[in-house]
C-alpha cells in the first residue's frame, strides 16, 4: 500500500514510521518543517494546520502519490481532515480517523469531559473559570489540588498545577481554559483500536512513571499487562464508545486518591507510544487491506 503519514517529525509520526520500516509498504511522510528520516520513501512539506490551503495541498499529495491509506497524527489538523474525509475531498484514500462529530468533541477538552460525564464515564470534577466565584470556591468544589489547561491545545502546552487558593489567580483565566481536580495517583496512557464491528477492540496500556509537569519533560513509560490494570482498560474502551470513536485512540488516565481511574484527555489519533503497541497499527493495516 501507499501510506501517507502527517506530522512525521513529531513523536506520533516517528513512532508509526519506525513500525512501517520493516514492511513492504511505500511510506510518504509530510510535515510543516523539513524532516530527515531514513525510513520513509518520500517527503513533502505541507502548510500548518491553520493554513486554509492545507487540505487542498494534502489532497493534491494524495492524488500525486496514489495514496491508499492516510494516517493523520497532528492534533490541530484532525477536525479539518475528518471534515475533508467526510466530504470526499481526499480521493479514494482510506483515512484513519473517527467521525467528524467525535473528533470535534475530543478537540475541545471541555466538550470531551462533558460528553464523558453525561455518558457515565469517570472523569475528575471540572469546570470553566466562570463556574466559580473565587479561587477559594474552586478549591472548595474541586479539592486540595487543581490543574488548569487550555481547552484546545496540544500535549502539555499551557498546563499548570495549583495547590494554594491564596496563590491561584482565578481572574487571570477565561473560559478558553478548563479547570480540573488533580488526580494524584498513577498515570496511564491507554491506547485503543476500535473496529467497525461491536466488540472488536484492541487495548494496550502504558504507565507513565515520572512526575513532571513541564512540556519539555519526557515521562518514563513502560508497558503494563492489561490484566494488571483491567479497570483502566475497561474505562478506556467505555470512553471510546461514549464518544463514538473509531480506529486508533490515545487516552490519558490517572487514578484519584481513592484509587479509581478517571479519564483526563482523549486524542482521536495514534499517540507517541504506539511503538509499544504494534498490534494497533496491525489492526489498521488489516482493516485497510
Predicted regions located by residue number:
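A short glycine-rich, hydrophobically flanked beta-strand micro-motif that places a catalytic Asp/Glu
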Residues: 246-258
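ATP-binding N-terminal substructure of ATP-dependent carboxylate-amine bond-forming enzymes
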Residues: 1-96
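ATP-dependent carboxylate/phosphate-activation module, predominantly the ATP-grasp catalytic core
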Residues: 162, 174-175, 180-244, 255, ...
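Active-site nucleotide/adenylate-binding loops and adjacent lid/helix of ATP-dependent enzymes
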Residues: 102-185, 196-198, 230
Amino acid at each position: 500500500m501507499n501510506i501517507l503519514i502527517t506530522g512525521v517529525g513529531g513523536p506520533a509520526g516517528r513512532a508509526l514510521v519506525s513500525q512501517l520500516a520493516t514492511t513492504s509498504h511505500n511510506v510518504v511522510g509530510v510535515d510543516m518543517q523539513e524532516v530527515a528520516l531514513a525510513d520513509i520513501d518520500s517527503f513533502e512539506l505541507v502548510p500548518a494546520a491553520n493554513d486554509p490551503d492545507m487540505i487542498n495541498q494534502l489532497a493534491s499529495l494524495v492524488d500525486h502519490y496514489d495514496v491508499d491509506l492516510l494516517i493523520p497524527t497532528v492534533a490541530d489538523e484532525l477536525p479539518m481532515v475528518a471534515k475533508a474525509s467526510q466530504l470526499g475531498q481526499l480521493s479514494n484514500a482510506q483515512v484513519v480517523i473517527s467521525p467528524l462529530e467525535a473528533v470535534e468533541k475530543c478537540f475541545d477538552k471541555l466538550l470531551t469531559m462533558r460528553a464523558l460525564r453525561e455518558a457515565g464515564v469517570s472523569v475528575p470534577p471540572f469546570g470553566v473559570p466562570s463556574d466559580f466565584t473565587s479561587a477559594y470556591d474552586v478549591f472548595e468544589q474541586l479539592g486540595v489540588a487543581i490543574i488548569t489547561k487550555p481547552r484546545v491545545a496540544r500535549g502539555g502546552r499551557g498546563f499548570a498545577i495549583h495547590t494554594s487558593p491564596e496563590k491561584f489567580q482565578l481572574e487571570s483565566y477565561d473560559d478558553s481554559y478548563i479547570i480540573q481536580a488533580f488526580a494524584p495517583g498513577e498515570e496511564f496512557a491507554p491506547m485503543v483500536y476500535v473496529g467497525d464491528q461491536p466488540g472488536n477492540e484492541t487495548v494496550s496500556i502504558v504507565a507513565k512513571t515520572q512526575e513532571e509537569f513541564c512540556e519539555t519533560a519526557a515521562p518514563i513509560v513502560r508497558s503494563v499487562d492489561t490484566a494488571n490494570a483491567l479497570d483502566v482498560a475497561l474505562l478506556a474502551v467505555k470512553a471510546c464508545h461514549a464518544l463514538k470513536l473509531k480506529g486508533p485512540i490515545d487516552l490519558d488516565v490517572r487514578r484519584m486518591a481513592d484509587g479509581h481511574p478517571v479519564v483526563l484527555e482523549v486524542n482521536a489519533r495514534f499517540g507517541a507510544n504506539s511503538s509499544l503497541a504494534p498490534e494497533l497499527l496491525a489492526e489498521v493495516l488489516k482493516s485497510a487491506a
